[in-house]
Amino acid sequence: MSILPGFLLSFAIAIVSYLLNRFIFHSLGSATIAILLGIILGNLYFKQVTLFAGTAWSEKKLLEFSVMFLGATVTFQTIGKLGFSGVGFILIQMISTIIFVLFMGKKLGFSANVSALMASGNAVCGSSAIAAVEPVIGAETSEKRTSIAMVNLMGTILMLSLPFLGTWMFGNNDLLRGALIGGTEQSVGQVVASATMVNPNTTTLATLFKIMRIIMLVFVVLYFGFRSKKQKRNEQGPTQIKIKRNSFLPWYVLGFLVLCTLDTLIHFVPEVSATAKFLSGWCETIALAAIGLRLNLVEFIKAGKKLLIYGLSTLVFQVVLALILISLLIK
C-alpha cells in the first residue's frame, strides 16, 4: 500500500498548522496545532484505509529523523547541563515507574504481558518501547493494542497539561520544566509537542531528558526478556525467547549522538545548525500531524473502567514522583 496519501495529508496539515501559528495562534506552536488538528480531522473525516500506511510511516520515520537532526543543534556541553543529578532523576523515575506499574497491573488483575508493556511504554518511550518489548515477552496482538491505546491516551493528557503544571510549579525555569516534560511524557512526539508550548529552550532540554530515557530502552528490553523467560521457565519448564537485536538501540539515537559529537568536536557553522533545526522542525510537525490522525478516541472509550484506573493511577504516580525528584535532585 502506498504511503503517499497519508504522507501528503500529514504534510498538508503541517502547512496549515504553520500558517495558523504564524498568523493567528502565535503562542501554541506549529507542532501543537498539528497534533490537535490531526486528532480532530482524523476522528471526524479522515478514516480511510488508504491513509493508514502513510500516516504510520510519517509518525514513525519522520519523528525519528526529527530527533536525529536535533543532534546537530546541541553539543555535549548542552547535555552536560543536565549533570549527574539529571541522570539520577531519570534512573530513579524510570525504575520507580516500572515497579509501580507492575504492582498496579497485578493488583488490578491484568496479565503479566499487559503489565510489562504498560510499564515499558510509560517508563521509556511509549509505543516504540511497547513494540520493542512485545517480541521478547511473547505478548499477544490484543495485549499490545490495549497497552498502546492507554499509553497514548495518558500521554495526550500529559502533553496538554504539563506545560501549564510545569510553569505553575517551576516558574520560568526551563531546565526544571524540561525535566518534568522529558522525564514523564511517554513518546518523543508528545515530549516535543508539550515542550513546544513553553519555548524552544525547554524543548531542547526536554528532548535531552527524553533521549536519556530512550538510551535506557536496551536495558528495559533485556530486563523484561529475562523476567519473561524466568516466569515461563517456572510455569512450563525450559523455554527460549529470542530477543531481536534491532529492538535494542534506535538508530536515530545513534544518529543524534554522532551529530552531537561532531558538533562538539568541530563546531558546525551556523548555517548547518540552522538547516538541521529547520529539517528537525518540519519532520516533527508532519509527524505530529500523523500522530493526531491515527489517535482513535473511540478506542479509549471502549477501554473500560479498570484500564482507565490503571492508566490514571500511573499518570498521577509519574507526575507526583517527578515533581518530588526534581525538587530534591535538580532544583
From Swiss-Prot:
Location of this chain's protein in the cell: Cell membrane
Superkingdom of origin: Bacteria
Name this protein carries in UniProt: UPF0324 membrane protein YdhF
PANTHER family (UniProt xref): INNER MEMBRANE PROTEIN YEIH-RELATED, UPF0324 MEMBRANE PROTEIN FN0533
Keyword Cell membrane: yes
InterPro entries given in the database record: UPF0324_pro (IPR018383)
GO cellular component: plasma membrane
Transmembrane portions of the chain: 2-20, 24-46, 82-104, 114-136, 148-170, 204-226, 247-269, 308-330
Membrane-topology descriptor: Multi-pass membrane protein
Similarity comment: Belongs to the UPF0324 family.
Keyword terms, alphabetized: Cell membrane, Membrane, Transmembrane, Transmembrane helix
Pfam family, one: Cons_hypoth698
